Amino acid sequence: MTAKHAIDPFTVEVIKRALISAAEQMFVALGRTAKSSVIYEVLDHGCALTDAAGRMIAQANGIPAFIGVLGDAVRDVIGKFGLDGLDDGDILITNDPYMGGATHQNDAVLILPIFYGGEPVMFAASKAHWNDIGGKDPGSWSPSATDIYQEGIQFPVVKLFNAGEENRDIVDILARNGRIPEMTLGDMRAQAASLRVAARRVQKICNKYGLDTVLESIEVYLRQGRQEALAELRKLPEGVYEAEEYIDDDGLGGDPVRVKVAVTISDDEFVIDYTGTGPTCRGPINSPLSVVMSTAKFAYQSIVAPHADPNEGFFSPLRVIVPEDTVFNPKRPAPVSTYWESDAYAGDVVWRALAEAVPDRVTAGHFLSVCGTIVCGIDDAAGEWFISVEPNAGGWGAGRGKPGENGLVCSADGETYILSVEVAETRYPILVDQFALNVADGGHGRWPGGHGLIKDYRIANSQALVTASFGRNRYPPWGLAGGQDGTPNQAEVHRTDGSVERRGRFSSEILREGDVIRFITGTGGGYGDPNVRDPQAVLDDVLDGFVSIDAARAIYGVAIVGTPPRIDEEETASLRSSVH
């Protein structure tokens, strides 16, 4: 279908912005109507529009690993039902990690075909974290899972709504397979309603400009996306760039898992090859293929054109190679519920490979892990389940000319947030005893890494269960250009008897009233030789409590003396000259 006249570039841009706005309205509608704090506070969801072939044409800010998989999920719908098998008002659901829209079972994909003139012309798709969908542990995702069947119910692509009517059979199955069915069904209906918001917006756009003009504009701006990517790609240095890293272990305490990449940059292609990456793991850190492909997309965009509008055309120069039966491309029934513990490395190792080639676009390593947590149990006062799910923020790596950021969510989490103290204490039987910057020694450099966080949750219930998965607990964030490595992530249980347990993972650990779970996220890697950091900046760090006087002398070569503290310039010059 084509327009009857040439479309001017202004109309193309207006229609593109209108479609992006429709995706953003979908995102906001879901956040405002969901029942779970992991959606309305954390914003653990993503939304996008595709064309009738499943090509991504517009997205809202959200979790990067969600956006890239939604086109795959739409293509699964088309592959199963065909366009002729869809009716106006249908909404389809899938959460199967081994299908195209995969992450883990908690992340449900809902898809609505948008009809205009009696035909499906686009799709609205969203993915959101549902707090509990069954499985062996409350909250469903589990660091101790050994197969996918322990991680909750799985839906292949099925119709959740038939021509606008709820499929009661599917709804009943959902209600019987979760510990908090009213929360799950509330989130499901909010998600469905948000798709309808996007559909109405798209239909208004088609009414205003005409379907032919809208579809032709999409083709034009997809071509523009490819042209923009190629133009930026040609500014990058050609070559093959390699790196490798190690994931802490196989998810169950075994050996470290190798992650290897070779990035090939040419004038017309950006190839990410993960050949040499370690095998499928026993534990649940395996990443389904489509989420690794999505992570490769945002790593590619961050290097090629960070501020471009992402769409199928923009990503067309990217080619990703992922061998089968690896941690990045596992086989059913391998567990995947803490997939982020490997998937995050799919982006991180690309940045590490390119750090010297494009130093203005890459920072040192950051704390990397989602550092996901669940605090749950039967509320003593209400007699019902409570399940709090959230990520944790941490320290980012420094870049050339810029210190790292303090307390931001990891790269894979994108536009998400942690729970506020007020929401945590109001919604759940939790008291927040401490919420502070982690000033552990590490991440020093000419530009130091950003600080992680320390957060203490004291249990205000007779009993609670705590689950936590804090990857990068053995191998800290890497420094660049002479900067020092950062510090690892860690979780600790402090019991009322004075005992302390420190681990990278807890799985449904029983806590009693008064026990404290402490979440510690790492400091990012530093950039550049610490001995050339501006002495005044070092003094400021000392005054702020980020660097000790001893570390200022030993690491930065800055002598700080007196009360109030000041720089001894003569001794500083002597210290620094002895190093160089």
Each PLM stretch: what is its role?
Residues 1-88, 93-580:
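Glycine/proline-enriched, intrinsically flexible loops and inter-domain linkers
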